[in-house]
């Protein structure tokens, strides 16, 4: 049992007013709102850092399960009540602490936004104190965590947003936000770019709505709607006991982004190739241009980022390819309910040799593998499919039919060339030839079941030391 999370984006229309977008004043309202909420968040970050002992306080409570008094860490809601009691001026507590008077610094701020800032500050300070405690236990001088920052995308709790997307055939769709104009807080309508995709995801049964976040960028603004869903899934040990278990193995590569094989009862019953559709070469040309421009511009200035538009284009290409490959993997898993998704346990893969642009391209390809793995895990878990990472040793070197060590080769102008990067695999024992990526994907199943040379290592038993 677990919880799956997904996010659906709803872009705000900030185009020209003549084109149906929001006017420039409404854009300024969003910037002012984010700015004042960052200042409020900074106020409470400083407040909790000054009273850090309160965050580690233990409170007593009566446990209905154990029928006795127990202790637990103070909750975020209790910290919120305590912070409001000492910083906000109300009839119940008209005299807040003089140096921490929030009502004086931020008059007329809606209490919903104030509580959103307090909750964010609690999470930031608790994470900082936890990291600092871990660093102090290591005894190292380097790596000291820095103080938490106050910038964050504001959470829009109930009472600060009203969404009205209308029917699918309507063109006028708006979202009403409570924003800060620089002088007061008021409700403002913003046109949005709604779609059938958003409406279907937003109203899909079984998903619980969370508070959306306002993500404001230089030239765009979006509302990110998070949704959660409780998932019932078997443990891997329980699934492995099933003799008819279906396993879905994925081998990640450069040209073939993912080679998916499905195995049941010891036989491969389905194979799917997900290619990059020219992504690797297209990305290499961009990175070659980037390397040349960086060389022409000379030594980079510290703190400045060059070629931001081109780098953003490369990142968006990788993200799009990762989501599409992960969706293909999740679609295969959806055909076999109760299956287990298998990936190789790949960690550090360093690009060596070649030119700077090729090393950069290999690094981007390696990062793309990690993105595909993470997105596929999330999408598959939303369907009740559990993911397992297996030992990757020898998956590309051993035969998936007999288990003998083979070799990789390629055909260049009709000649057979043996190379580590060969696209084909050949076994000298059983004379089996196949696509090298397919062979590696089939071996991932053998690694999961600990077949052939993928046996679990036996722990060395300590030998008794003779006495005397």
Across the structure, where does each feature detected by a protein language model lie?
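A generic secondary-structure signal for well-formed alpha-helical elements
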Residues: 41, 48, 125, 129-132, ...
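Positively charged, helix-rich recognition surfaces that bind polyanionic ligands
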Residues: 4-6, 221-468
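Short glycine-/small-residue-rich flexible loop motifs, especially phosphate/cofactor-binding loops
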Residues: 31, 92, 125, 330, ...
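Acidic carboxylate diad motif detector
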Residues: 70-217, 272, 362, 366
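Generic detection of short hydrophobic beta-strand segments and adjacent strand-loop junctions
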Residues: 4-21, 184-196, 272-276, 403
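Residues in well-ordered beta-strands of folded domains
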Residues: 11, 164, 178, 213-215, ...
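Broad gene-expression machinery/nucleic-acid interaction feature
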Residues: 7-9, 158-160, 172-176, 220-222, ...
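Long, compositionally biased intrinsically disordered regions
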Residues: 1-120, 133, 295-304, 310, ...
């Amino acid at each position: 049992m677990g919880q799956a999370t997904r996010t659906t984006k709803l872009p705000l229309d900030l185009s020209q007013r003549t084109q149906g977008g929001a006017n420039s004043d409404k854009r300024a309202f969003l910037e002012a709102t984010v700015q004042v909420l960052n200042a409020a968040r900074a106020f409470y970050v400083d407040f909790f850092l000054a009273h850090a002992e309160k965050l580690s306080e233990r409170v007593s409570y009566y446990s209905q399960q154990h029928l006795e008094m127990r202790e637990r860490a103070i909750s975020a809601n209790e910290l919120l009540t305590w912070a409001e009691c000492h910083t906000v001026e109300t009839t119940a507590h008209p005299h807040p602490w003089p140096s921490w008077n929030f009502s004086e610094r931020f008059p007329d701020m809606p209490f919903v936004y104030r509580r959103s800032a307090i909750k964010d500050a609690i999470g930031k300070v608790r994470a900082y104190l936890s990291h600092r405690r871990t660093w102090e236990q290591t005894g190292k001088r380097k790596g000291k965590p820095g103080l938490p920052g106050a910038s964050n995308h504001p959470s829009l709790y109930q009472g600060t947003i009203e969404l009205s997307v209308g029917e699918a055939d309507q063109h006028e769709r708006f979202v009403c936000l409570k924003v800060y104009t620089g002088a007061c807080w008021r409700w403002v309508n913003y046109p949005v770019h709604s779609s059938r995709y958003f409406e279907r995801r937003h109203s899909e049964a079984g998903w619980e709505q969370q508070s959306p976040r306002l993500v404001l960028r230089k030239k765009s603004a979006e509302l990110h709607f998070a949704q959660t869903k409780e998932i019932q899934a078997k443990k891997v040990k329980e699934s492995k006991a099933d003799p008819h278990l279906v396993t879905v193995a994925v081998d990640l590569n450069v040209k073939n982004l993912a080679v998916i094989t499905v195995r049941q009862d010891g036989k491969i019953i389905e194979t799917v190739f997900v290619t990059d559709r020219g992504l690797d070469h297209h990305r290499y040309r961009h990175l070659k241009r980037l390397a040349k421009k960086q060389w022409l511009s000379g030594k980079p200035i510290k703190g400045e980022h060059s070629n931001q538009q081109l780098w953003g284009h490369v990142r968006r290409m990788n993200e799009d390819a990762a989501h599409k490959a992960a969706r293909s993997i999740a679609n295969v898993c959806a055909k076999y309910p109760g299956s287990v998704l298998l990936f190789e346990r790949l960690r550090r893969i360093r690009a060596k040799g070649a030119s700077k642009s090729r090393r950069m391209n290999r690094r981007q390809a390696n990062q793309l593998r990690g993105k595909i793995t993470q997105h596929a895990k999330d999408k598959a878990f939303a369907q009740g499919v559990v993911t397992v990472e297996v030992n990757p040793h020898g998956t590309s070197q051993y035969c998936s039919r007999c288990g003998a060590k083979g070799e990789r080769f390629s055909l260049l102008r009709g000649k057979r060339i043996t190379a580590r990067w060969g696209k084909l695999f050949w076994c000298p024992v059983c004379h089996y030839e196949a696509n090298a990526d397919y062979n590696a994907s089939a071996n991932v199943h053998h690694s999961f079941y600990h077949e052939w040379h993928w046996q679990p290592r036996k722990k060395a038993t300590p030998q008794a030391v003779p006495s005397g």
